[in-house]
From Swiss-Prot:
Annotated positions binding carbamoyl phosphate: S52, T53, R54, T55, R56, R103, H130
Top-level EC class as recorded in UniProt: transferase
Binding site for putrescine: H268, C269, L270, P271
Function: Catalyzes the phosphorolysis of N-carbamoylputrescine to form carbamoyl phosphate and putrescine. Is involved in the degradation pathway of the polyamine agmatine. Also has weak activity with ornithine and cadaverine.
Catalytic reactions of this protein: carbamoyl phosphate + putrescine = N-carbamoylputrescine + phosphate + H(+)
Modulation of this protein's activity: Inhibited by spermidine. Inhibited by N-(phosphonoacetyl)-putrescine. Inhibited by N-(phosphonoacetyl)-L-ornithine.
Top-level lineage group: Bacteria
Name of the featured protein: Putrescine carbamoyltransferase
Residues carrying the site annotation Important for structural integrity: K27, E143
Length: 339
């Protein structure tokens, strides 16, 4: 039975801990010059309905470093649900590659793709969530845990618009038993459906969440996180209107960092619009870990690919006798036939 990674809602806290541990172990090995060929001869199909920098490069590099290959399918090269149905696309690609990743415009597309594919499917981002970012962020927070604290002791504050990254950060922090705050303006906060899912996580993990427009909510934060201000509302608000909503109250500047605390770390999924949601002083400052965070997109994707492929193959083991027979038959054919 194959396993997909469409949302962390289908993963346990323990599984996420394991994914972090695996990812960081592989990272350590590669830093020391050992590239474990855990995906040798494996191929990844990458479907992009939207352009990407970090996601595409991370998946391609991960496959290369671990002995496999990534095939990039650019916007316009493949049409999910266009001329060919999603069902047919997933069935065909399931026979051509070993694992699929898709960055889609609508979440139902990745759900349909995963339901129809016979191989593991990874959500590279949708309009609902960004689960690969979640895993990378979790790896980053584990690496930068405040001295003497466990994950469950940490407070994570997301500042600004309720983007899919904001929701995903809420999902992963509440799943891990952390304390999550969304500090954003009314009308741009996590909605009731989002909050219900965070509450469900908290019931299991013992974590907490708060949605507020109170600026004092950043106080005592271990991690302060922001994203661009134009994510979900680009077509609805002009730049001038966005600035009126978010600036200056929701800009992460040095004053906000100081209010959070001297040891608070700054995070951003990138790309950042410097001068809007964050100042140069903060993003380039000593407490900024957003570039470690960007590196950990690769770190976490390596671990995720290995986990999904190993789990899949463990449940679908190759028949070694048939494999040996096929090898022998091919060798005999090549020895006895000529063109």
């Amino acid at each position: 039975m194959k396993r997909d990674y469409v949302t962390t809602e289908t993963y346990t806290k323990e599984e996420m801990h394991y994914l972090v541990d695996l990812s960081l172990k592989i990272k350590e090995a590669i830093k020391n010059g050992y590239y474990p060929q855990l995906l040798k001869n494996k191929s990844l199909g990458m479907i992009f309905q939207q352009s990407s920098t970090r996601t595409r490069v991370s998946f391609e590099t991960a496959m290369e470093q671990l002995g496999g290959h990534g095939e990039y399918l650019a916007p316009g090269q493949i049409q999910l649900g266009g001329h060919e149905t999603i069902e047919d696309t997933s069935r065909v690609l399931s026979r051509l590659v070993d694992i699929l990743m898709a960055r889609v415009e609508r979440h139902h597309s990745i759900v349909d793709l995963a339901n129809c594919a016979t191989i593991p499917v990874i959500n590279g981002m949708s309009d609902y969530n960004h689960p690969t970012q979640e895993l990378g962020d979790l790896c980053t927070m584990v690496e930068h845990l405040p001295e003497g604290k466990k994950l469950e002791d940490c407070k994570v504050v997301f500042v600004g618009d309720a983007t899919q990254v904001c929701f995903s950060l809420g999902l992963i922090t509440t799943k891990m038993g952390m304390n999550f705050v969304h500090f954003g303006p009314e009308g741009f906060q996590l909605n009731e459906e989002h909050q219900a899912k965070l509450a469900k996580n908290c019931e299991v993990s013992g974590g907490s969440f708060l949605v507020t427009d109170d600026a004092s909510s950043v106080e005592g934060a271990d991690f302060l996180y922001t994203d661009v201000w134009y994510g979900l509302y680009e077509a609805e608000l002009s730049e001038e209107e966005r600035m009126k909503v978010f600036y200056p109250k929701y800009q992460v500047n040095q004053e906000m960092m100081d209010r959070a605390g001297a040891n608070c770390k700054f995070m951003h999924c990138l790309p950042a619009t410097r001068g809007e949601e964050v100042t140069d002083e903060v993003i380039d400052g000593k407490n900024s870990i957003c570039f470690d965070e960007a590196e950990n997109r690769l770190t976490s994707i390596r671990g995720l690919l290995v986990y999904l492929m190993n789990d899949y193959e463990a449940k679908n083991p190759y028949d070694l006798i048939k494999q040996a027979e096929a090898k022998k038959e091919l060798e005999v054919f090549l020895d006895t036939q000529s063109i």
